[in-house]
C-alpha cells in the first residue's frame, strides 16, 4: 500500500511540474529593447540594447537577443551579454536565477543552456562552471568546468540546514 501511494504521489508531482512548464511555454512572449530588426521571410529577429523578454513566469535580460522562429512560433532564444540573466519561478514558488555570457533557451524543450561564466541559483544552492544545462520542466541540471586547466572546475555551494531558501 505504501509503495502504491508513493508511486501515485511521484507521478502526480511530475505531472504538476509538466503542466506548469507547458503553461509557461504557451504564454505570449513580450519583448522590450532599444533596437529590433526582423526578417518576415525567415522569422529571424534580433534585439539589441537593454533587452528584456518575459513569458509567463520566465524573465530574460541581455545586451543582445536573437529569436529563431519556425512554423509561426518562437523555437529558440539566444542571448549575449556581460552577463545575460534569467529568472524563473518554478511551480513550487522557488525562484531560480541563472546568468552567463551566453545563454540560450529552447522554448519547446523548456531547457536553458548557460555558457561562459555560468551560474545557477536554485533554492539556496549555487552552481558555477563554464557551462550549465538546466531543464526547467524536470528541474535537473548538468554542469561542466572549462577544458583549459584544473582552475576551471565546477563549484557547488550548498547552504547549511536552516539557512533561508531551504
Predicted regions and their residues:
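Mature-chain termini and adjacent capping regions
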Residues: 1-166
